Regions:
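Amphipathic alpha-helical assembly segments used for oligomerization, scaffolding, or translocation
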Residues: 20-21, 27-283
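N-terminal Sec-pathway targeting helices
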Residues: 1-13
Length: 283
């Protein structure tokens, strides 16, 4: 008998753990508060929710949700002849909850599915973010549901920030800027952002692109200094510019190693000789 009771208790614990896990995985399928429709309008909304939202896929459910919310808003604005609102504050809140509790799980399942895809569009991301902001503004979501909805906003913001990092990698003009790119890449090189194939490729190449951008800028600066040696007014002024250019090369090599600066160094060395002769003759 004791063995049977023990087995039953263990089974109940397992079921309980599984239920909790399912709740957090599913996000919003089990709201803490169950709304029972009592007034005729609440029941009307409940019927619309059952037929138009529940069991439908995201596009249809999303349209239905917004239509139903619009209906609630319209009815809530109507006043009776005595000046009182046609719907009480309680009715409005209950109707919104009925619609929210049916729609939020569909939204969360869709957004998880969308962020698992390898290609995203700006229009869909903006729509998801706007939808998430709208749902949170209703102040109904809580727990896992709230976390899932809020995560949409964070994901979209991080996606845009990550692309900004990728773009800025092509305009790095200092060692500090390159190191900053490396740090930011590490920050954003994670799921679900890396599910997006284009962004993943951009992040993977950003550090290399940043170093290449800096090296190109250093080489261009060396060429400019070398080619304009006659414009400095004195050899000392030219020498200061040459040393600054060489210091940038040394800083790069010390920070990252490598770098193709042979031609730049040769150009500066030749310009140094030319500058000595030029300023000796003309000043």
């Amino acid at each position: 008998m004791k063995k049977i009771i023990k087995i039953i208790l263990i089974s109940l614990v397992i079921i309980g753990i599984a239920s909790v896990a399912f709740y957090f995985y599913n996000g919003t399928d089990t709201p803490k508060e169950q709304v029972i429709a009592t007034t005729s309008f609440e029941k009307e909304i409940e019927n619309q929710v059952k037929s138009q939202i529940q069991g439908n896929d995201y596009p249809q459910a999303s349209k239905a949700f917004h239509d139903i919310m619009s209906t609630i808003k319209t009815e809530a604005s109507i006043e009776n002849v005595d000046g009182k609102k046609q719907l009480t504050t309680n009715e409005v809140a209950n109707c919104q909850k009925i619609a929210f509790y049916a729609y939020a799980p569909i939204f969360n399942r869709y957004q998880k599915s969308y962020f698992s895809q390898s290609s995203w569009t700006d229009s869909e991301l903006n729509a998801l973010k706007a939808q998430a902001q709208e749902l949170l503004s209703m102040n109904i979501a809580e727990g896992a549901a709230k976390h899932g909805i809020a995560k949409v906003i964070a994901n979209v913001n991080d996606y845009n920030a990550a692309w900004a990092v990728v773009r800025s990698a092509h305009s790095c003009y200092s060692v500090a800027a390159v190191k900053s790119i490396k740090s930011k890449v590490a920050q954003y090189n994670r799921a679900p952002l890396t599910n997006n194939a284009s962004l993943r490729a951009g992040l993977n190449s950003a550090y290399t692109d940043a170093k290449s951008s800096l090296a190109s800028n250093i080489n261009a600066n060396c060429r400019k200094v070398a080619q304009s040696y006659m414009a400095y007014g004195s050899y000392d002024n030219y020498l200061a510019a040459e040393e600054a250019a060489l210091n940038r090369i040394n800083e790069y090599v010390n920070a990252f190693g490598g770098g193709s600066f042979g031609n730049a160094k040769n150009a500066l060395a030749q310009a140094d000789n030319d500058a000595i002769n030029y300023y000796a003759k003309n000043y």
